[in-house]
Amino acid sequence: DGSIPQRIGSALAAHLFKGNPYYSMATSRKLRVMISSRCMDHFPGPEGTPLTDVRRELKKSIEAEKLFGAKAFEVWINEDAEALDHSKDSWDACLKQVRDCDVLIVLFNGHAGWAKEAGDIGICHAEYIEGLNTSRSKVRLIELPTCAATSDVAQTDRNNRFKSFKQSESAFRGGIVPQDVPTLGAVENQAQRLGGL
């Protein structure tokens, strides 16, 4: 029940702040993260895991992280979005997600993604550009092993434009992820041998 001063303080606070917009508490929202990459490509190679599965696992892992005991992140991946065809509407919807997110994680494997027109840039390329144009500081690029070559000339051209653009930017890069990615246990064992843990 609390002491008399506590009850008076609570009653006074309720009276003073009730309905007063100047004294209302700020409401916090979760940080919005978007993961941009191809979905159907495989990581780390043709026999590896589809990037869709990698993206879902990343989403689950990021959303499980807590800050001061509260879940702090909300992750958007297009696999969980409302189904749209490859039209102007789905293109615009993806770019809107880029503008609205607080952090954009680009999983770069050199594949630019689908395009509205044969000579255009791909959706992954467009998302990367939109992120840099919206706020460079929110973009994080993780370089994966390069995707396999394609016989589609227009797609090859898009991929080459994307690779050239990425090379011209000085965005934060998380490094190149090798094909033979060690397990967390192997990394911890190596760190212990070196006296790091």
Q: What kind of region is each of these model predictions?
A:
Residues 81-83, 145, 184:
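Short, solvent-exposed coil/turn elements at secondary-structure transition points
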Residues 5-12, 17-23, 27, 147-197:
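C-terminal interaction surface of TIR/SEFIR-family domains
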Residues 82, 119, 175:
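Conserved short-loop catalytic and cofactor-binding motifs
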Residues 105, 139-142, 179:
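Hydrophobic/aromatic beta-strand patches that form the interior of the parallel beta-sheet core
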Residues 12, 17-107, 133-134:
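Conserved N-terminal substructure of TIR/SEFIR domains
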Residues 54, 58, 93-97, 124-127, ...:
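A general structural detector for well-ordered alpha-helical segments in enzyme core domains, enriched
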